[in-house]
Amino acid sequence: MASALSAGLIGKRCAASDVLVIVPGEAVRQRSQDQGTHTAAGVTPQLAQQRIWILAVKPQQMKEVLLQCQPYVKDDTLIISVAAGIAAQSIAKWLAVNGKPHNRIIRAMPNTPAFIGCGATGLMALAAVEPNDKLIAETVFKTVGEFVWVDNDQAIDAVTAL
């Protein structure tokens, strides 16, 4: 999904040099580099320079990845998670700084047709997410199809059935 999102962003919304893709897999990383995107094999201090993080991580890897990312999160960092079944409150807790959860979290659940730009994505935001953050998420997910905002974590997973 990270490949589909970065390709959509680069093709429609921003320059490849403005995107940092962290991908452990060499083949996917090479495809991103071929598009001109900045890439890294793992969490890097460069992450602290990015205000928007899109985490397209396998659910079983999410906690470990977030704990590695936690030192680089700032108050204004917008986290967009594309990991099935990982509650927004869990993400907020794993990114906590000094015991304070990081609540600028948007969950996104695109369905499979997003890979070809014809998908439907469910979006859900915690209360601390600002209106402009929602517009950013909408801009990202318009690149791979339609989107719909839902009210809670339970409703978001139903969107993948569309």
Residue ranges and their predicted role:
Residues 22, 45, 153-155:
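Residue-level "edge-of-site" marker
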Residues 1-42:
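NAD(P)+-binding Rossmann beta1-loop-alpha1 motif at the extreme N-terminus of oxidoreductases
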Residues 90, 94-104, 120-158:
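Internal alpha-helical scaffold of NAD(P)-dependent oxidoreductase catalytic cores
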Residues 26, 35, 42-123:
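Rossmann-like NAD(P)(H) cofactor-binding subdomain of soluble oxidoreductases
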Residues 14-15, 74, 100, 142:
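Short conserved AdoMet
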Residues 4, 31, 64-65, 90, ...:
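Phosphate- and divalent-cation-binding pockets in alpha/beta enzyme and binding domains
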